Amino acid sequence: MIAARLPELIPELGRCLKPSDFVVAQDGSGDFFTLTEAVAAVPDFCRDTTRILVCEGTYREKIAIPATKRNVVLESRGAVTVTWDDYAAKTGATGRPLGTSGSSTVYFGGDGWTVRGLTFENSAGRVGQAVAVQCLGTGLHFIGCRFLGNQDTLYLYGAGNRDGETVTENARIRFDDCYVEGTTDFIFGSAAALFRNCEIRSTADSYITAASTCRGQ
């Protein structure tokens, strides 16, 4: 009885014991219905870790995580897929093509994210560049995740890809026990990326990577 009331009796201990700060569930049993809502609720520039638990389901969302959302643990309960179908040549709301970056299903702009057990998909098909995940932040760690697409599935942007750019510091991203698939250049960008115990599968007879190594990297 007393153990069950510890979080109530000692608020600081309650925060330590709490398994997640936000729960996302499509059936309404959580704090939010969508990941977009949960990301928006993360405090800006927070030094403490925010935990988001995503319950089983397919979430049809295009998510842009800004640089202000940092130090987040995002993990799944059951099979979770985040999917969208934009592609670079698609006309956006401005009347212009979305471009490669604009085609991303999920954009990670913040630092220090740890992501466990989610599947990220760009379902546009073989229509040219269509990014599933774009990473601009540093200190990102993906564990047991799946990245599905065709051309340009995983965009590890890093410091950028401008001609002649010299960098002294660049984004570092780690992948453990992950699965990545695509057709052409489906892992690309200028970030420093480590893939450990990952399966990388080409679904076409083409190039797997298109690295962009800046001077000074």
Indicate residue ranges for each PLM-predicted region.
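Sequence-level preference for short, compositionally simple segments enriched
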Residues: 1-217
